[in-house]
């Protein structure tokens, strides 16, 4: 995570301020972070924005739902043994999968690799899980697989209250961006 007083940190603080207004207006607690392709900075943006909210006293939970491209555990040198997929498949309890990374900042890793299907993500399990977690956290940020490699965003859209679409300057093609925007609406 970057120093929030650095130039990049100040940029994340500006994004956080804009996001804070949208969250307050929509009364959203569950925000998905998504990109078009892998390696566009989605996970980095998510973690730094989550950290900026945690730094002002918001109790934040980050969930890695990018099962095929799971990386959030690596930022904290954590194992990816038990996580979201294990909770969904009833192989682990929620409390077993929540890891405290710092004050006000918890993480649920993606867990073992599985194929998210309509039967898993469309089930009430994720909805019930998020309802339970919303009682404990001010904000829940969900790391969602890129739109070009997965339809997870569509499968999770019924439980995610808003999306942040992260693009990489001079890399994300405008046609792909248009497709992603259509995909999310």
Question: Which stretches of residues belong to each language-model region?
Answer:
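P-loop NTP-binding module
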Residues: 1-185
């Amino acid at each position: 995570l970057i120093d929030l007083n650095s130039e990049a940190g100040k940029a994340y603080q500006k994004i956080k301020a804009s996001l804070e207004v949208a969250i307050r207006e929509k009364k959203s607690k569950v925000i998905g972070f998504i990109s078009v392709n892998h390696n566009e900075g989605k996970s980095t943006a998510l973690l730094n924005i989550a950290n900026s909210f945690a730094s002002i006293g918001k109790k934040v939970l980050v969930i890695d739902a990018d099962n095929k491209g799971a990386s959030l555990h690596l930022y904290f040198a954590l194992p990816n043994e038990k996580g979201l997929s294990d909770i969904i498949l009833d192989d682990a309890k929620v409390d077993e999968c929540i890891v405290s990374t710092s004050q006000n900042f918890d993480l649920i890793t993606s867990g073992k690799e599985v194929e998210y299907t309509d039967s898993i993500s469309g089930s009430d399990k994720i909805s019930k899980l998020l309802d339970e977690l919303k009682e404990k956290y001010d904000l829940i940020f969900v790391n969602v697989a890129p739109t070009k490699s997965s339809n997870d965003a569509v499968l999770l859209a019924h439980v995610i209250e808003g999306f942040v679409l992260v693009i990489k300057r001079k890399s994300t093609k405008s046609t792909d961006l248009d497709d992603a925007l259509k995909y999310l609406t």
